[in-house]
Regions:
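Long amphipathic alpha-helical segments
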Residues: 6-127
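Glycine/charged-rich beta-loop-alpha catalytic/anionic-binding loops adjacent to active sites
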Residues: 32-35, 40, 44-54, 135-141, ...
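Short, glycine-rich nucleotide/cofactor-binding loops
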Residues: 40-46, 78, 167-175, 249-254
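Gly/Ser/Thr-rich loops at beta-strand to alpha-helix junctions
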Residues: 61-63, 168, 172-178, 201-202
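Ligand-binding beta-strand-loop-alpha-helix segment within the catalytic cores
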Residues: 109-164, 190-192, 196-240
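Histidine-anchored nucleotide/phosphate-binding helix
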Residues: 178-187, 263
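Conserved phosphate- and dinucleotide-binding cores of soluble alpha/beta proteins
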Residues: 199-292
């Protein structure tokens, strides 16, 4: 069973990043212009996938899906190489894809390492290139399943804390965690009002979170980033929620610029703020995180 069930358009696997074996390309939904336009960035090489990740064609959990699908594409690219050259080619692909975004590079390395390990096992056992390509594509889908199941469960945990008839303020686009709590709200028949802070400069809140919430049937209002404290003072917001790019082992939360001021305002007005995510053992403290 796929874990993107009952989620909106933007979170369906094929609409995040998808490797087409017949065409030999990875399609990535261009979130920079969605929902005004539904266009896909077509990548014919793993280098183009890495560039798309670096250029913010996709974000949040999107780069993880793109990296895994990019490894399948790399296997397609190098299918006519000698065994030794094929392995080196895949190692280069794993490095390029995992280091496309500095802030999440350590987490991305786990994605490409899994793909590379599978590749090494298959090639060692004498698998044909078409079998390798298919296996890496399926592995990318399975990695999606694992990530979606974990993150939507975290989102569901937040949803269970929110009473019926509440209003929430979101920031940026927490992707699968957002999908998780929205889906859980629907499953438990809760009537929730969603305020989406626009989140400059890419407007992920206005374009992505708001589109997903509306797509899934919620009463959704986009607000400018400088309206947040006013709405809090007018008691129009009951809960604040965002994702977290990195949570270090000392409890520090690193996220989109602007998160701190929302958290401070929420604290001032006595509004619960939930940053959804998981501690990253690669970072002991916030000082070790490279900020883009």
């Amino acid at each position: 069973m796929r874990e993107d069930y009952n989620l909106g358009f933007i979170l369906k696997y094929e609409n995040v990043a998808w490797f087409d074996e017949e065409c030999g390309e990875v399609r990535i939904l261009d979130r920079r212009i969605y929902p005004e336009k539904k266009e896909f960035c077509i990548c014919k090489t793993y280098e183009e996938v890495a560039k798309a990740i670096a250029d913010m064609v996709t974000q949040s959990g999107g780069p993880f899906a793109a990296a895994a699908m990019g490894m399948a594409l790399a296997a397609y690219q190098g299918k006519n190489l000698s065994k030794t050259a094929y392995l080196e080619f895949m190692k280069d692909a794993a490095y390029a894809l995992s280091h496309a975004r500095p802030t999440t590079s350590k987490a991305m390395q786990l994605v490409t390492a899994e793909s590379l390990s599978l590749f090494e096992t298959l090639i060692k056992n004498g698998a044909f290139s078409n079998e390798i390509i298919t296996a890496l594509k399926q592995n990318a889908v399975e990695q999606n399943n694992v990530r979606y199941k974990k993150n939507t469960a975290a989102g569901s945990f937040f949803a269970d804390l929110v009473p019926d008839e509440s209003s929430i303020l979101t920031q940026c686009f927490g992707e699968t965690t957002v999908g998780g709590y929205l889906r859980r709200f629907k499953e438990t028949d809760k009537n929730i009002k969603v305020f989406c802070a626009e989140t400059r400069p890419y407007f992920q809140g206005a374009r992505l979170t708001a589109s997903l919430a509306y797509d899934m049937g919620f009463d959704t209002t986009v607000i400018t980033d400088n309206m947040i404290a006013l709405l809090m003072s007018e008691k129009k917001i009951n809960f604040c929620v965002s994702a977290s790019d990195v949570i270090s082992l000392d409890g520090s939360i690193i996220n989109k610029i602007g998160t701190l001021q929302i958290a401070i305002a929420a604290s001032y007005f006595g509004i619960p703020y939930y940053a959804i995510g998981f501690p990253d053992k690669n970072y002991v403290s916030a000082k070790e995180v490279k900020i883009e």
